[in-house]
């Protein structure tokens, strides 16, 4: 294993802006933040972490994906970019993750995206910064409970721009362009290296060598078309190291006495590093429109529309196919068809072999193409009523939202003309690749998702003599369906919340939630979840007034329960499930000697139980406690610390592996509220910002730490206590403990063995249970694989309208297991990685 890997990357951005330079803080003590159901609360009305990001901070970063713009901005969010693409490979995923991005929010990877109070998978909307007014990060328990069960693991609450009343029209145009560089592509051996390593492997195994000296000499010519000794550099033929990037955005907003508006249009184009196939690129167009109008004195009506249209064009190969075939497997091409094999005259003939039956270079050129087209439409309409004529401070808000997502993949799945080849015989018979062509495109796959949301909220605000009360009740309904699930997924819940603040020093909040889900039996469909919060602004106390270097000191805490349910989880798990099938049985007269029951075939029908009923199935529950401290001092520094403990109980899992075989139910599922785990962690941040005339400087550092421990698991029964997973972290890495290498034959004969074919130089493993043999009972925890600390450094320098930002993020205190998968690249005659080449011995 690599010992305590620490990774760090830096992003340098230079921005020319037409707006003033703003401070780099993400927590503003003098501002308000948006909360669920169109609520706005000041810093002195909340008991949570108050993590909010404004449009200025987002627009200052020139990165094409919104998730990348969040990198390093606050300790609660950890963003890892795994690849440099922008298209969404997880359009169904309820969280922010994809194959290119891994996003954690206080240890959870299941946070959701909420746009204008409507949940939508992030991959289906992909908003740009000029469409966003603010992002509020919901991390503390009471803040999450305000929205409901879907936010149980945290959420990004995005509020889009609406324009402003009595505001002149403002037009903002921004453009980005650049080049993406693939800095790390796995390296694999060239043809000569492969031949030598293959010879060595065969010699060790007692086989004759395939590649004689004249073959090695031939491979050294590096000729991909050599009919005797080909050596193909697939990486240079199929990949490039750069790709173009460009983005343009236009936003204009404003308003008059009765109407306000906001319109945004954005386009993004990204190339690809795959070059030997049909067009490989990604294009995205999105637009948003918001129109709000006052109708009379007490009514405000608004309509918001967001749409996304994206195209992902690609061939039938992926970037990693360059390593799938050894460089010496066959020549790239073998000539041209004479027309006697069913192909057109002069059709290129590509080489394949009996061992490696796919020529990925040819597949990229002639294997066809496909275009993934995504279309998203979000339409929200709302009516706000000012009921102060009835009760002063009373308001009503009604919203209806409809979301439609359609993904269609259209293309051609064609084939190239391939012949088998060997170095001894040259061109052989035609392969299974016969050069099939299609006359037109066809639909290769499709996916649809629909969501209907509705909520009604009554709110009441009152303030007098230093007392402030904000209260509300919200009724929410969500209805979701998608192509992969024929059943509707429905949630219905009611939340009641109240906040009380006295002289901006003492704040109390309560949230009560009564939630229901269609996933459960009617007797267990609804559950009650309460939350509470307290905050004390110590700096406003009289005894603190003489300490002038302290600008703000606030202690806050929240504690409560929230329901856990997967909105797209399998429904009706509380019911039994059966499947019917037919089978043939041989009975009757016996006309063959090898037939036991006869040779007349009779069709019989039978029913199999796939799932056992559990009518007691119900909500999983999440208990969470949060404690935080905010400390601003010297009118330049801002410090925050947040500690949290979260325990998940009664998660729904399949416990069929715990049923004794004597029950006769093997192969049948049984779901139960069973597993339990807890998470504990902390976030810290320290920021500095100062403006000196036309100069501006900012600096910040933040860090977070967390770990998740399993408290109850299924099938956790072992002979030895040290093998139990209960009580260990979820990222624990289990394996045999290596204590050295065999150096003598005496060691081989005397020490516990794990195979009968031990050789000098093989690894020695510890016999943990002292039973004289090495087996699975000797597996112990060797390390953990998730970082124990994520951190970020932010630096900013500005002069008038010129600004430089430096953002660095990293992770520390974890280990990467060097498993057999690293060393077994090239098993048999397969290709070898450079890692294997460099670590032989």
Regions found by a protein language model. Give the residues of each.
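Catalytic-site beta-strand/loop segments enriched in glycine and acidic/polar residues
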Residues: 114, 471-479, 507-516, 764-786, ...
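Conserved RecA-like P-loop NTPase ATPase core
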Residues: 70, 117, 135, 158, ...
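Extracellular/periplasmic, surface-exposed regions of secreted and cell-surface proteins
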Residues: 290-299, 305-309, 353-413, 423-731
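Structural motif
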Residues: 115-116, 502, 799
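Surface-exposed, extracytoplasmic segments of Gram-negative outer-membrane nutrient-acquisition systems
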Residues: 601-610, 647-676, 707-785, 803-841
């Amino acid at each position: 294993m690599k010992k305590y890997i620490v990774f760090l990357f830096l992003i340098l951005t230079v921005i020319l802006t037409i707006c003033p330079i703003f401070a780099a803080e993400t927590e503003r003590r003098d501002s308000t933040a948006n909360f669920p159901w169109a609520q706005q609360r000041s810093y002195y009305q909340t008991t949570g972490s108050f993590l909010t990001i404004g449009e200025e901070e987002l627009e200052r970063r020139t990165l094409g994906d919104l998730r990348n713009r969040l990198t390093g901005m606050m300790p609660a969010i950890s963003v890892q970019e795994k690849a440099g693409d922008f298209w969404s490979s997880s359009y169904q995923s309820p969280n922010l993750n994809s194959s290119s991005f891994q996003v954690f929010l206080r240890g959870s990877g299941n946070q959701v995206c909420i746009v204008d109070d409507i949940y939508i998978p992030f991959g289906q909307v992909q908003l740009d910064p000029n469409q966003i007014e603010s992002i509020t990060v919901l991390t503390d328990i009471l803040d999450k409970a305000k929205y409901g069960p879907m936010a149980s693991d945290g959420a990004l609450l995005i509020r889009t721009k609406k324009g402003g009343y009595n505001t002149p029209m403002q037009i903002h145009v921004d453009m980005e362009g650049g080049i993406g560089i693939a800095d790390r592509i796995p390296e694999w051996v060239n043809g000569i290296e492969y031949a030598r390593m293959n010879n060595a492997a065969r010699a060790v195994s007692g086989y004759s060598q395939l590649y004689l000296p004249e073959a090695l000499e031939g491979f050294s010519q590096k000729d991909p078309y050599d009919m005797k000794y080909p050596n193909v550099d697939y990486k240079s033929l199929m990949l490039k190291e750069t790709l173009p990037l460009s983005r343009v955005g236009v936003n204009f907003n404003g308003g008059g006495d009765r109407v306000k508006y906001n319109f945004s249009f954005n386009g993004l184009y990204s190339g690809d590093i795959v070059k030997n196939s049909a067009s490989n690129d990604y294009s995205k167009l999105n637009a948003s429109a918001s129109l709000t109008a006052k109708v009379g004195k007490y009514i405000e009506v608004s309509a918001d529309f967001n749409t996304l249209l994206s195209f992902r064009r690609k061939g039938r190969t992926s970037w990693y196919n360059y390593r799938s075939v050894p460089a010496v497997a066959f020549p790239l091409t073998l000539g041209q068809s004479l027309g006697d094999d069913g192909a057109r005259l002069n059709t290129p003939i590509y080489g394949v072999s009996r061992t490696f039956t796919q020529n990925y270079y040819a597949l990229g050129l002639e294997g066809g193409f496909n275009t993934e087209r995504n279309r998203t439409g979000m339409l929200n309409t709302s009516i706000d009523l000012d009921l102060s004529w009835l009760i002063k401070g009373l308001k009503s808000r009604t919203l209806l939202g409809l979301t439609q997502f359609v993904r269609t993949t259209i293309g051609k799945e064609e084939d190239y003309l391939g012949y088998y080849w060997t170095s001894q015989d040259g061109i052989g018979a035609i392969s299974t690749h016969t050069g099939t062509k299609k006359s037109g495109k066809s639909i290769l796959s499709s996916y649809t998702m629909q969501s209907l949301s509705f909520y009604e909220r009554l709110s009441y605000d009152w303030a007098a003599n230093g007392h402030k009360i904000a209260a509300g009740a919200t009724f929410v309904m969500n209805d979701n369906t998608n192509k992969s699930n024929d059943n509707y997924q429905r949630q219905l819940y009611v939340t009641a919340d109240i906040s009380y603040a006295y002289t901006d020093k003492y704040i109390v909040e309560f949230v009560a939630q009564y939630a229901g889900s269609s996933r459960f039996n009617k007797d267990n469909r609804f559950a009650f979840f309460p939350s509470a919060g307290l905050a004390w602004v110590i700096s406003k106390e009289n005894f603190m007034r003489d300490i002038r270097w302290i600008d703000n000191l606030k202690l806050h805490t929240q504690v409560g329960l929230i329901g856990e349910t997967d909105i797209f989880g399998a429904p009706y798990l509380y019911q039994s499930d059966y499947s019917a099938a037919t089978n043939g049985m041989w009975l009757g007269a016996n006309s063959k000697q090898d037939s036991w029951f006869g040779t007349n075939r009779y069709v019989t029908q039978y029913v199999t139980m796939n799932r056992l009923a559990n009518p007691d199935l119900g909500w999983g529950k999440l208990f969470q406690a949060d404690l935080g401290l905010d400390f601003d001092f010297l009118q330049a520094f801002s410090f925050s610390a947040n500690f949290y403990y979260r325990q998940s109980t009664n998660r729904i899992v399949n416990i069929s592996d715990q049923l004794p075989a004597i029950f006769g139910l093997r192969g049948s599922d049984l779901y139960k509220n069973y597993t339990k785990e807890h998470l504990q962690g902390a976030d810290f941040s320290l920021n500095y910002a100062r403006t000196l005339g036309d100069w501006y400087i900012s600096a910040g550092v933040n860090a977070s730490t967390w770990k998740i421990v399993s408290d109850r698991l299924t099938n956790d029964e072992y002979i030895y206590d040290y093998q139990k997973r209960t009580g260990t972290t979820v990222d624990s890495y289990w394996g045999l403990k290596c204590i050295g290498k065999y150096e003598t034959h005496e060691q081989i004969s005397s020490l516990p063995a794990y195979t009968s074919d031990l050789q000098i130089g093989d690894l020695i493993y510890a016999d943990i249970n002292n039973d004289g043999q090495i087996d699975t009972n000797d597996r112990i925890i060797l390390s953990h694989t998730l970082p124990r600390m994520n951190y970020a450094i932010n630096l900013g320098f500005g002069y008038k309208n010129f600004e430089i930002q430096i953002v660095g993020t990293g992770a520390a205190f974890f280990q990467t297991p060097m498993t057999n998968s690293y060393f077994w690249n090239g098993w048999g005659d397969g290709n070898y990685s450079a890692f294997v080449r460099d670590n032989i011995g």
